[in-house]
Amino acid sequence: MNMSATLILAFAMSMDAFAASIGKGAVLHNPRFRDAIRTGLIFGVIEAITPLIGWALGFFASQYILEWDHWVAFTLLLILGGRMVVEGFKDSPDCRCEKVKNHSLALLVCTAIATSLDAMAIGVGLAFLQVNIFHTAMVIGCATMIMVTLGMMIGRYIGPILGKKAEIIGGLVLIGIGCNILYEHLG
């Protein structure tokens, strides 16, 4: 696969994470640039690892992985998105205490995994092509880091405009991403 095809693949793979990061940036109250970089790194590393896992598993059990990856992604995104929607409707007198809870490492990792399961499926497909999987995975990870960092900063400016609705919208975006993943695999 040539470099332009690799870049197109990488940025296409980062779109789910980009959309989720806009929602995350909007929910947080004035996230700093280092928060955006940290989130970008988490998403980027996970997005780089999942095609490697998929590539390795592609030699052993591709039919089983491809049968279930979309259901796992859908379920994780539905749960995370549903949680955000419910939290968005709760009255919260002190928004500062919500910031830490909504930006926990566990939640970031879980969201990153959910949005990167399609990259694992791509990795399975790449196992049957003549590609340098390590190079491709690194490009996917870097593209995701850039897009997530950018998404967080865009969300930072959208959040104050939307207020508490940002969390509801962010949750709906995650649910929408999950539904889209399910639709693409079942449709």
Swiss-Prot record:
GO cellular component labels: plasma membrane
UniProt keyword Disulfide bond present: no
Any one Gene Ontology molecular-function term assigned to this protein's record: manganese ion transmembrane transporter activity
Membrane topology: Multi-pass membrane protein
Keywords assigned by UniProt, alphabetized: Cell inner membrane, Cell membrane, Ion transport, Manganese, Membrane, Transmembrane, Transmembrane helix, Transport
Its job: Probably functions as a manganese efflux pump.
Stretches that traverse the bilayer: 3-23, 41-61, 62-82, 107-129, 143-163, 166-186
UniProt xrefs under InterPro entries: Mntp/YtaF, Put_MntP
Identification of the protein by name: Putative manganese efflux pump MntP
Record flagged with keyword Cytoplasm: no
Gene from which the chain derives: mntP
Primary location group: membrane
Protein family (similarity comment): Belongs to the MntP (TC 9.B.29) family.
Domain of life: Bacteria
Subcellular localization, as worded in the UniProt entry: Cell inner membrane
